[in-house]
Swiss-Prot record:
Keywords: Glycosyltransferase, Magnesium, Pyrimidine biosynthesis, Transferase. NCBIfam families: pyrE. It comes from the Bacteria. HAMAP family: PyrE. GO terms for biological process: 'de novo' pyrimidine nucleobase biosynthetic process; 'de novo' UMP biosynthetic process; pyrimidine ribonucleoside biosynthetic process. Its cofactor is Mg(2+). 5-phospho-alpha-D-ribose 1-diphosphate binds at residues 26, 72-73, 99-100, 103, 105, 124-132. Pathway: Pyrimidine metabolism; UMP biosynthesis via de novo pathway; UMP from orotate: step 1/2. This is Orotate phosphoribosyltransferase. Homodimer. Catalyzes the transfer of a ribosyl phosphate group from 5-phosphoribose 1-diphosphate to orotate, leading to the formation of orotidine monophosphate (OMP).
Length: 213
């Protein structure tokens, strides 16, 4: 685990974005942890979040021309990541996002920001079922652009309805790499460093045994 990944886990815990306990997911699964990126909701939170996304992007080595944030949650992520890349990595790259409803006046179409072209890095909070990615792919392809990769905050590394995860399905269906700031493996490594969290570690490991990929 790299220093920025440990810092991201601590940041998420401090904002209660990441919680340990017992939670029922939308799928009905009982999970020993919960991650709600919507609680990164202040100016300082967003500034820090962008730095973590930018760090993971640079660390990945994936080459891309433009950041795309799918509406709605991806919009502030794309914006703050673009700012962080410019301020901290001297990479001044364009960004773009879609609006859910097409506008019939003023700025045309359902895209805002730079023209959607070249190699696109899609940024979002998490991938649950991959629906937002599939919708975004239609937009990307319709504009003649290509998907360079996908960056999310957390990869839960668990099976979806099939034997592989929603993330693995996206990688298979779109022949792209999905990267994340942290994974379930990183969470476990973090918990292993914290004796006071042994109870949570046991629960997360048991969950991975049952649902992990």
């Amino acid at each position: 685990m790299k220093p920025y990944q440990r810092q991201f886990i601590e940041f998420a815990l401090s904002k209660q974005v990441l919680k340990f306990g017992e939670f029922t997911l939308k799928s009905g699964r009982k999970s020993p942890y919960f991650f709600n990126a919507g609680l990164f909701n202040t100016g300082r939170d967003l500034a820090l979040l962008g730095r973590f996304y930018a760090e993971a992007l640079v660390d990945s080595g994936i080459e891309f021309d433009l950041l795309f944030g799918p509406a709605y949650k991806g919009i502030p992520i794309a914006t703050t990541t673009a700012v962080a890349l410019a301020e901290h990595h001297d990479l001044d790259l364009p960004y773009c996002f879609n609006r859910k409803e097409a506008k019939n006046h003023g700025e045309g179409g359902n895209l805002v920001g730079s023209a959607l072209q070249g190699r696109v890095m899609l940024v979002d909070d998490v991938i649950t079922a991959g629906t937002a990615i599939r919708e975004s792919m239609e937009i990307i392809q319709a504009n003649g652009a290509t998907l360079a990769g996908v960056l999310i905050s957390l990869d839960r590394q668990e099976r979806g309805r099939s034997e592989i995860s929603a993330i693995q399905e996206v990688e298979r269906d779109y022949n792209c790499k999905v990267i994340s700031i942290i994974t379930l493996k990183d969470l476990i490594a973090y918990l292993e460093e914290k004796p006071e969290m042994a109870e949570h570690l046991a629960a997360v490991k048991a969950y991975r045994e049952e649902f992990g990929v």
